[in-house]
Amino acid sequence: MDKLLIQGGHRLSGEIAISGAKNAALPILCAGLLTADALQLSNVPHLQDVATMLKLLRQMGLQIEQDGDQVTLNGSGVDKLEAPYEMVKTMRASILVLGPLLTRFGEARVSLPGGCAIGTRPVDQHIKGLQAMGAEITIEAGYIHAKAKRLKGARIVTDMITVTGTENLLMAAVLADGETILENAAREPEVTDLANLLVAMGAQIAGIGTDRLVIQGVERLHGASHAVIADRIETATFLCAVAAVGGDVTLRKARTDTLDVAFDKLREAGAILTAGDDWIRVQMSSRPKAVSFRTTEYPGFPTDMQAQFMAMNCIAEGSSQVVETIFENRFMHVQEMNRLGAAITIEGHTAIVNGVDKLVGAPVMATDLRASASLVIAALAAEGETLIDRIYHLDRGYDRMEVKLSAVGAHIQRVK
């Protein structure tokens, strides 16, 4: 099993190219199920989750051609309307095939999801929404079995804001009969990216980027070309790394309009940020100042950036409070950071981080995707050598992170 070996204490300088967003690419790939025509996608990131999704779609009969970051999908031969447990257990985003399969083919059988070990994340909102559109749904032997002759438009109010729920119901609604209104819809940029692709395919969607999406169902969708948006979480991860370690790094192919809350917190920590249309420069010459924050839905502070900012706070001047409101089990990185010498205590949904003068390298273990990224940041800032085990979590959501960091001066290598 691969590990990362990191020698800490080296400032970062140079340029890093940001990859396409994992959380946009996964639903967008599933949109290939909605049409018999070709979908041409670019800026698709090289990630384990993307490879898993492509494998699942191939199993269903989707024709797929890959060339670098370009992926062409053709859904004319889809004949297997099932996502089996073996695929879904490694990646909960597999649930995103449910809406497209049901709305285009009238049937779907999808295993209940797995993915990271950070809480339950139930799929009941997906099921309730599809039932409101007329689907007959049974859950037996760990599978969701959904049937519908043609879905009917409906007004759906989700009990909670759910990103994958919004995406699934949006894809189901575009081919439904009549008008669907999604209230309390997720506003994440990745949802907007999916909606923009669907419109390019011929869907009729109003309210894109708001919490109220109005969809007029159409008979069929056609092919389209689309570039996946830049990954704001990867972008924030590298910004945090420079803020924690010090240096001067420019991020290319980045999106600046989706990172307001991260920019505010990094400036509060003492980083100097400048940005253009598709680049961000971060300069850090002093020890960061501690910043407190509370995770919440977009446009608030993303739960997917919580661990990385906590890593920066570990060696910051002062103490900070980090409140996690999205997932109930998302402080698993804390005990690993404390092994490096951090001073973090947990009280319920709050982590209290007392900044220390230095972290010292040690063997640590990644527990989930963003936790693994936070351990990389902590290791880069630590004195001496850190060995991070179980980095398959990192590969699920980061495109060759160690290669990108090496290019800006980090002493980091993948070892067996």
UniProtKB/Swiss-Prot annotation:
Single GO MF annotation: UDP-N-acetylglucosamine 1-carboxyvinyltransferase activity
Function as written in the Swiss-Prot or TrEMBL entry: Cell wall formation. Adds enolpyruvyl to UDP-N-acetylglucosamine.
Pathway involvement of the protein, from the record: Cell wall biogenesis; peptidoglycan biosynthesis
Annotated positions binding phosphoenolpyruvate: 22-23
Any matching Pfam family: EPSP_synthase
Name this polypeptide is given: UDP-N-acetylglucosamine 1-carboxyvinyltransferase
Recorded name of the encoding gene: murA
PANTHER family with a match to the protein in the record: UDP-N-ACETYLGLUCOSAMINE 1-CARBOXYVINYLTRANSFERASE
This protein's UniProt keywords: Cell cycle, Cell division, Cell shape, Cell wall biogenesis/degradation, Cytoplasm, Peptidoglycan synthesis, Pyruvate, Transferase
Family of the protein in this entry: Belongs to the EPSP synthase family. MurA subfamily.
Binding site for UDP-N-acetyl-alpha-D-glucosamine: 92, 121-125, 304, 326
Catalytic activity reported: phosphoenolpyruvate + UDP-N-acetyl-alpha-D-glucosamine = UDP-N-acetyl-3-O-(1-carboxyvinyl)-alpha-D-glucosamine + phosphate
GO CC entries: cytoplasm
Gene3D superfamilies from the UniProt entry: Enolpyruvate transferase domain (3.65.10.10)
Main location per the UniProt record: cytoplasm
Residues found modified as 2-(S-cysteinyl)pyruvic acid O-phosphothioketal: 116
Location of the active site: 116 (proton donor)
Cellular localisation: Cytoplasm
Organism: Herminiimonas arsenicoxydans
A biological process from GO: regulation of cell shape
The protein's Enzyme Commission number: 2.5.1.7
InterPro entries reported for this sequence: Enolpyruvate_Tfrase_dom, Enolpyruvate_Tfrase_sf, MurA_subfamily, RNA3'P_cycl/enolpyr_Trfase_a/b, UDP_GlcNAc_COvinyl_MurA
